[in-house]
Amino acid sequence: LVEDNDQLARAVCERFALDGHAVDHATGLNDASAFVDTTYYDLILLDIMLPDGDGRDFLARHRLAKNKTPVIVLTARSQVSDRITLLDLGADDYVTKPFDFAELEARCRAVLRRQGGAAQNRLEFAGVILDPQEATLTANDNIQNLRNRELRLVEIFFAAPAQIFSKNHLMDRLFSLSEDVSENAIEVYVGRLRKKLAGTGAEIETVRSLGYRLVARP
């Protein structure tokens, strides 16, 4: 993450930590260049207006050096011409400030899926295959389509089988801070997924007073 706004950077880092991601934070281009030169990253989130330079120059050098790490630009510029320039310089996507964290996470997932390819991003548990790019669950040749939040919830469980997730944790992962939702919303989505997993080798188990976890059926 290349961002000089400490409050925003802290919020982004904390949000991605909930997803199990490790985030290095650079406040300027010099630190960002040092990080990129010594470490391989899955994704770069890049602010444009930085105290020691223009993020677009960093992006141009990044691509000139044949570095294929995907870059999502965080920008306050909303003009179409600005966005076209960013894409032409090699940005994989952009998010306009102020942004919704749920949208930022969704764009990151989409870019990473394109980068890795559909086959590499499929997850399998107990004979059930999750294809995030197609938004489907497949078991015994039976394909179930997933809506956006259903997909996000399945990804959380499939990425960490047997791990217990509280309702509050799942609410933080599925909904933005601006959305007024209750724990009942999580119960509704878990109920939908249980129906789609019925008859497969996987199930979402309720752990009393703690939350939910993905387990293999006995």
Set out the residue ranges of the language-model regions.
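Residues at or immediately flanking beta-strands
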Residues: 22, 70, 120-122, 185, ...
